Amino acid sequence: MAKEEGTSVEPRQRKKQRTSGSQEAKAEKIRRTPAPERAPKYVSFQRFAKIVIGCLAAVISGMMHVFYLSAYHERKFWFSNRQELEREITFQGDSAIYYSYYKDMLKAPSFERGVYELTHNNKTISLKTINAMQQMSLYPELIASVLYQATGSNEVIEPVYFYIGIVFGLQGMYVTALFVTSWLMSGTWLAGMLTVAWFLINRVDTTRIEYSIPLRENWALPYFACQVAALTGYLKRNLNTYAERFCYLLLSTSTYTFMMVWEYSHYVLFLQAVSLLLLDIFSVEQSDKVYEVYKVYIFSLFLGYLLQFENPALLVSPLLSLVGAFMLVKCLQLNGKKGTFVAKVIKVFEFYLLCTLPVTLNLIVKMFVPHKENEHVLKFLEVKFGLNMTKNFTLNWLLCQESLQAPSQDFFFRLTQSSLLPFYVLVLIICLLSMTQVFFRRMSGKSKKETVTLEDGRIGERPEIIYHVIHTLLLGSLAMLMEGLKFIWTPYVCMLAAFGVCSPELWMTLLKWLRLRTVHPMLLALILSMAVPTIIGLSLWKEFFPRLITELTELQEFYDPDTVELMTWIKRQAPVAAVFAGSPQLMGVIKLCTGWTVTSLPLYSDDDLLQRNENIYQIYSKRSAEDIYKILTSYKANYLIVEDAICNELGTTRGCRVKDLLDIANGHVVFEEGDKLTYSKYGRFCHEVKINYSPYVNYFTRVYWNRSYFVYKVNTVISFQS
């Protein structure tokens, strides 16, 4: 029996020895085989080639976007075949105001004189001197005018093409920055190309450049995209010193520039600062970097405060309060042995301070700093979230604006049709679950690995991923309330979704949860990170590329003959010193096309201008001719322009027409239960004044009309007929 056992065991032992012997032989052979000398150089060359190809792809993507915008703009407006007046009419509303100041700077006899006229402007709005540089953030127009004259471009290109070219160039930089951000997060420039594809396909929801070129956001968001790209690189682990310094420098310059070109930039940066604060709480090892970024915020705020002529809105901004509270907590930070009960109590106390100190600091600052700039924003938010009810015309008019309403179902349908929304939700869920898993691992006291490899499958441990997930959730939550914010959120949806489907680490995280046995998870993750974006790209190419080509080949026409005729009449017939009154949007076009003084402008950061707008809009209410005359003469208006589109507005949403909002504000309709109806014995002014009977003809004389506009001269001498 023993012998049998011996014979049965012996073959197994020999087999084991043979196997171990062969492994040792292979290992010895590998050790003795000299490593090829060119391997490190080859790896360096491969990495260098990858970076060069990725950078070229990023730049080419940006340039292609610029060429596409230029071609589409030409096809839509026939810009090269238009006269100067017809070109300028394409700048509607507040966009017209910005471009008009660019023209004024080019006409100024000197740079100093031009800046002085901007900062002490009394030729735009009657009876009012404004600092246009501060109120409208006109640094882009100032710099564009300087570049146009300094480079000698006036001999080569028309001013309007130079201006549009700069904005289109910034849009190319915008796309390039999104490309780089997605590349940095995923490690492959394939993600950048998918980001650009989704951005272009969903451009109705990613940018407003096609509708209004001079908008502040079209100047500002490209710098914000550069700032986010720099921040993404700065937050990455194992970054060498030179790369970290470069990212920090780019972060500083882009943050400051972003703050200077858009008056609402500090609100966007506040959301980013909250995201970084949560990152600091979630990922302790990034605390020093978060502190450095906060230093950039505070430097940009104070430098912006000085260069924006001591703009009080920056001092009372929530961003400054949050940054100040964070730095104060860091100075008072107590040390406790990690993991002890005392350390946990200290952490809870610090979190409490970070929640309460910003509010306290903001209230203290507002006690000493006059801050009319933010009052209308707070009132609007109160009404928006149902905390208050109001009959105020301005607030209700703002609430009726499409950009300040909740997104429509069409928005979600478009994102789903391009496959963007489903993949974004998938990536977001995986990242959130991984972050939750990592959080509970740390709460349970498990040690964190210094370097996370692909095989670990922990996408939620990377600080830049944590930041982006938190940031996109905050932006997305607000975009669900106000559609205008989708133009900030949707580009980052494109970037995050593209990063996810192209990231082997994200697929590895998912596969480790599924615990597949048939295929090696790492191999499958690498295959999926290349196959899935390729399939998405091919499907997008097949479905949407023909549409993009059709848009470029399809001839469109934008022509507004009535507005052209009105502007021509004003330039030929109206006195140079005349003052015009009408809707703020039309006044912006008049200021640009004619240069004449107006009574109001489409600006919503000045309480006096908001009140002016409401008063001038009374021409569409049920007020007497005498009331309207008193309002117009109080602003020294010489001419009144009634727009038929507003007077006879049908509107899809009842209660949001200008005349409805005026009736609510004036008490001529029932707004809510308990209201007393105030009967108006007068008809709607814009209708009655067209009939030409007394007393309207005593106060106003019609001097011009066409299908869309009726121009009335405000009589200086009133003769009443008996």
From Swiss-Prot:
Membrane topology note: Multi-pass membrane protein
Primary location class: membrane
This protein's record includes keyword Lipid metabolism: no
This entry carries the following GO cellular component terms, namely: membrane
Please name the gene that encodes this protein. Answer: Dpy19l4
Enzyme Commission number(s) from the entry: 2.4.1.-
What residues bear N-acetylalanine in this entry?
Answer: A2
Q: What's this protein's function?
A: Probable C-mannosyltransferase that mediates C-mannosylation of tryptophan residues on target proteins.
Which protein family is named in the record?
Belongs to the dpy-19 family.
Membrane-spanning residues: 51-71, 160-177, 183-201, 246-262, 268-284, 291-307, 313-331, 351-369, 420-440, 465-485, 487-507, 521-541
- InterPro entries per the record? Dpy-19/Dpy-19-like, Dpy19L4
What this protein is called in its record is Probable C-mannosyltransferase DPY19L4
Gene Ontology MF term list? glycosyltransferase activity
